[in-house]
Amino acid sequence: AGADRVTHFLRKTKRKWDKVYCLKADISKYFFNIDHDVMMRIYESKIKCKDTLWLLDKIIRSDGDGIGIPIGNLTSQLSANLYLNELDQFVKHRLRVKYYVRYMDDFIILHNSKECLWNLLAEVEEFLKYKLRLKLNRKTDIFPVKRGVDFLGYRIWPTHRLLRKKSKKKIKRRMRKYEKEYIAGTLDIEKIQRSLAGWLGHAKFANTYNFRMDLLDKWQEIIEVAEKREDLVNMGGI
């Protein structure tokens, strides 16, 4: 949904303006820097049940350091989204930004003025610093959208989207690892199929037909090699 929204906004702004620029940013070490006091104030503004607040307080402050929430905790996803909802409201309602998309700790803003985006960036940085006690990653950039916008593993243009090169390399590395483990008999086929289905599901939303076919061909090769090995074992050839 996030990538679709970026595509929608890119098409909309392209029709509206001759030149479009993108502010792309993400929060530095987000989960590790969520402030417990700020998080609890946000919960207290939305939840009135004292028992629920007590439990949330215990969970959030479980490490005792005052900042950071455990990534694997069931409540962490909710807490992380709720925390940056404060940023969403600030950007949309206080700054009146129309073309804004956030997914977890990554966000983009589209505008036809670089100067306006730099000014918005300064406002966002100040809000994050003083209200949420966060800061942006140094990778923050403002650039023309004709370069394509990297978001959620895709590089997105108004007309199409591609898988990022990093995403493709990661998938290929994982497939090589699975191949070795499967042929060695240390990994079951169901796990590989689940992973492959997830990758293909992600890739199909980009212009990746050839890449997906290559993945399926590679998977078929792995199965054939493993089956031949099993036949040899059964025949006493190994």
Specify the residue positions occupied by each region the protein language model found.
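Short, well-ordered loop/turn and helix-capping segments at boundaries between secondary-structure elements
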Residues: 113, 130, 157-161
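Right-hand nucleic-acid polymerase module
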Residues: 118-119, 136-238
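Short polybasic/polar patches that bind polyanions
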Residues: 93, 130, 150
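Active-site beta-loop-alpha junctions of metal-dependent nucleic acid enzymes
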Residues: 1-2
